């Protein structure tokens, strides 16, 4: 019986690395697909004689067939693992995946709620005067008007809010602190919320946003409340506090803010992270076109 390098590798994963049956099946399918491909190119090709060009052609073949870059990357990872295993055991003389890079995944455009939808939610829809209604509206306003993260909002204490100077201090990723400005409208809303909270709830601790029992709100509490309110005005499938962060950034850029300013407000370490929002600012391009083109 001829030695089968793929079977040998799969047995290694099964009995020495204790990989799951699902992983083994995925690896097996990916590797056999590659084997079928290179043999269809040249019946004389083998695992030992495949080169970088064959690997690249295979990935292009998969992409041309409509496969997502992430799925091609998964198959490539299986192939690279096989060759690293084979090279370490002297089953092949070279690794044809060594200088090959998997296809880059296309960045998904951030989901955001339109300015008109946010205006409708905050200005037109009726909000009650109960503690929960006042709190939830203030939370949504805070997300939309400052762009802070969910973890940053749930971590806020009263001492972090300065309504006189209209700024809040947040602790972001890596415990990095930054100061974020906000407008008069949010300052009024925060003052109204704090007054309502102190009247209606017995607070346990220093948290700004609390439950009806006075405890600091958990992330899932905030997430569910935000989703429920956003669903009243938006048909987006994904509705969350992070979508409000995207909405903040998009609104800022659409209305003339620079990438660097938005980067600092969001607490991004690199402008490359913020640049993804430039793909969503079509309204700004539309306005420029309408103002500048003689036939617009």
Each language-model region and where it sits:
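Conserved catalytic core of the tyrosine transesterase superfamily
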Residues: 1-296
